[in-house]
């Protein structure tokens, strides 16, 4: 398990969640190095429309693309998934 600083405190990335991310979003593997900066200093944070304890943290990593990291906040903050996107979720 790896831990990262974030605006919500420490966030965990479990081996199971990392496996999920790389399986369903293989393009994220080469952008893994951007996880610490995206979590520590996101450019945009959006709350999920479906779960008030879930937030999406965005940070531009290449021209026109953002790394989006989805974090569940509760007694144990953890990463649900991560993906690349051209669009930031609208409020």
Name each region found by the language model.
Residues 1-91:
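Ribonuclease/tRNase effector modules and their secretory precursors
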